[in-house]
Amino acid sequence: MKMPDLATTGSDIRLVRWLASPGQWVKRGQPLLEVETEKALSQVESIATGVLKEVRVLPNGLVPAGRVIAVLEVNASPPAAIGGSQPLRASSPDAPPAAAPARYKKTFLLSLYERMLLIREFEERVKLLFLEGTMAGTIHQCQGQEATAVGVCSALHADDWITSTFRGHGHALAKGLSLQELLDELFGATTGCCKGKGGSMHVGNMEKGMLPGIAIVAGGIPLAVGMALAFKMQKKPTVVACFFGDGAVAEGAFHEGVNMAALWKLPAIFVCENNLYGASTHISKVMKNTRISDRAAGYGFRGQTVDGNDVLAVYEASRQAAADCRAGNGPVLLELMTYRRTGHSRRDPCHYQPADERDAWFSRDPIQRFSSWLTQQAEISAADFEEIAARIQVQIDKAVENAKQAPLPTVNDLRKGVFG
């Protein structure tokens, strides 16, 4: 195992301490060592499941990226983990999903579960690919927020549109982008959804109704409003769902965009994924009224706060919002309360999240809650979960192998897509 490139301005990384000892069995993704850069302390996770046979760097030593730091003996038969052969269980049974199972077909419920699990497992694999050094740049991941993307996009029509942010992998998979085109894009390949020119922060596919992600905070809001205006002028029954984070509501673009949408009664759903943090700053430090949905009243349209970790609650709220838009009632602001299980980006150790806060939110993990509810209320069997998990792993494994062999842009690709 090599020291990953942590994109520091300095050349070396200081190893603070090992979090596992030689001879210890470790799981893929388990924190293995703590390191320090000029930015912050962070943890480096194991790239495989197995036994830590040897450590080759001592604490306080300076380590350049790419140097071998440990030897792992890969375990051929690791025990089942989240997303493995066992159904996920909720640790918060007193907070089940809101809707009744009789209203939904089994195939639909399982499609929601599979899409959420695909997003989670995709993000976990991407994290490991980054640590292995096979993927360049940085990534902003959405583990813990799968229900917001899946719930909203499942309520949209195929010809509806979404705008996204720098944290857009889940939005892309939920809107129908293929696993392969998304992974190819993260590898910078010409077969990626943006021909390798967008990268992690700008994924999208115009043919599938997803504008390439906008990395500027609140940058997608004016674009979504413009699209909604165009659809209204063209008399199309098309809705635009605009994803943004809680930090975006402090930007002028939010005020300008929602004000215009309200004034002209545009078919836009403003989807605020409120995960409580703008980068490392808690929402309570920047807002007196932290209930973001209340802001809609000031512009004269409906706002609603929803449990963003309940995929069915998100789906129902989004379906009603879309119906309101199509009926000509104007925009809707949905505030989806959720929580990211990772740092702002891969270099963020996330030390600012209090342990008790993390524990409380982790107990309400959207995938665990939904799988438990499916087992108890919709009579989904363990075999169903096992089949889904196995299918996802095969898909991801195949996509990774293909992405590693995908063609990279050449000098001849430099001007493609720039003019005309």
Predicted regions and their residues:
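Cofactor-binding active-site loop characterized by glycine-rich and histidine/acidic residues
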Residues: 134-264, 285-288, 293, 298-300
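Short gly/pro/ser/thr-enriched loop/turn and capping motifs at secondary-structure boundaries
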Residues: 170, 276-279, 340-342
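Conserved thiamine diphosphate
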Residues: 232-238, 288-320, 363-389
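Small cofactor-carrier domains centered on a conserved lysine used for covalent cofactor attachment
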Residues: 1-76
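N-terminal amphipathic, basic-rich helices that act as targeting or association modules
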Residues: 86-167, 405, 420
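A short, conserved beta-to-alpha structural element at the edge of catalytic cores
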Residues: 264-284
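Intrinsically disordered, low-complexity Ser/Thr-rich linker and spacer segments
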Residues: 73-88
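Glycine/aspartate-rich loop-and-adjacent alpha/beta segment that forms the canonical ThDP
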Residues: 94, 324-420
